[in-house]
A protein has these predicted regions:
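Generic hydrophobic secondary-structure signal
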Residues: 1, 5-7, 27, 41, ...
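Short aromatic-glycine-(Arg/Gly/Cys) micro-motifs in beta-strand/loop hairpins
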Residues: 1-23
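Generic structural motif
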Residues: 10-12, 30, 73, 96
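Hydrophobic/aromatic beta-strand elements that line small-molecule binding cavities or substrate pockets
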Residues: 23-26, 55-57
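A short, charged, amphipathic alpha-helix used as a generic interaction element across diverse proteins
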Residues: 28-52
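Short, mixed-charge low-complexity intrinsically disordered segments
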Residues: 44-113
Length: 113
């Protein structure tokens, strides 16, 4: 089958522990190419650049997965001090093992009398 880099995000608003799949990046060249692409994404971003104002901690949690903590200081009008906004990403390498399109629902029958 084919290899992907999966990116899940958790913005941690109010202690919410919901992870959402935010990107499925197809990679040609096999597992080694997918690992290299995943590591690149963990160190930069999906676009390949790292915004200057963004802080980043990258943890390699296994040979094929990373946990990224991104932080940014945000200044609100009502506060003299900036607030730190933190987002977490899980980046992993995955092999697609099944691809099945959803079934088309049957057409509604119109009954005539």
């Amino acid at each position: 089958m084919s290899w992907y880099v999966l990116v899940e995000a958790n913005e941690s608003y109010g202690g919410d522990n919901t992870w959402d799949l935010v990107a499925k990046v197809p990679v040609e060249g096999g597992q080694a190419a997918a690992i290299a692409r995943a590591e690149e994404i963990s160190r930069t971003s999906l676009s390949g650049s790292l915004p200057e104002e963004e802080g980043r901690l990258v943890f390699r949690t296994s040979p094929t997965s990373w946990l990224v903590e991104k932080s940014r200081l945000v200044r609100h009008e009502r506060s003299a001090e900036p607030t730190e906004h933190t987002q977490h990403l899980r980046i992993s390498v995955a092999e697609l093992v099944l691809a099945r399109e959803p079934a088309v629902p049957p057409k509604k029958r119109l009954f005539h009398r």
